[in-house]
């Protein structure tokens, strides 16, 4: 009997990449999504009899209980993602990110393992040392605060694990252009200019396909990983904003201006260690150069920035 994986938020940026990978690996995949950002990224999967789609909202506890009943594994992606989107509608962010997660914990069966997509944003601003899974959390934004609360409740509930992902980038069936590397590449290619504030602020990055691969890895290694939290990314992908902008400039000629005034509203600034999950055998495979090359090719068919933003 095949394993049934239930993916909340499966029509989103990460969900579309994950769904395709899981189907290729032979899993039954049920996507539960309210289609807040549309569902076109899922269209290729409807030809696969192992793919199932349920339109629903994790804030609807009764519907969620009915939908999740047959699942073996739950991958919880559904969220209002990122500082700007949470700032725009704080109540919605709390309802989805915290209350929606509580609904899922309330209705899942004891045998159903939850794999939770958490975030490195939980670390906030932390300079002077690499953040490990034991580093005290210091979220600076509503997004980070809501994800930190939800992560804690998921782990406290048991039969679960959490991934604190680096900042995502790369091509997905459901694109996002509000992510740093995706946005910088788009502006370089389409606008031929970029004004950069606070250029020394650091992030760690992970390609969306590597995010999908991490969930696949966890499903195959549940007994070694359950009831724990893991940073997911690569130390080789720790870059500040200037370094990313210059990498893109090597591939796309554009005007880059470093502004002395102005403030990035997202004040995250940290570097992360990924030794813990690497010891288990998981390493990322797609670097920034490859990811940017793919973005440049994909952007030849993308002209409307707002269509692929979470804002």
State where each predicted segment sits.
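NAD(P)-dependent short-chain dehydrogenase/reductase
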Residues: 140, 152-203, 208-219, 248
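SDR active-site strand-loop-helix element
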Residues: 8, 32, 74-78, 114-120, ...
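Conserved Rossmann-fold NAD(P)-dependent oxidoreductase catalytic core, especially the SDR/UDP-sugar
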Residues: 76, 102-142
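N-terminal Rossmann/SDR dinucleotide-binding element
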Residues: 2-73
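C-terminal substrate-binding subdomain of Rossmann-fold SDR/epimerase-dehydratase oxidoreductases
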Residues: 191-192, 196-311
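NAD(P)H-binding glycine-rich loop region in Rossmannoid oxidoreductase-like domains
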Residues: 58-95
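Active-site helix of classical SDR
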Residues: 146
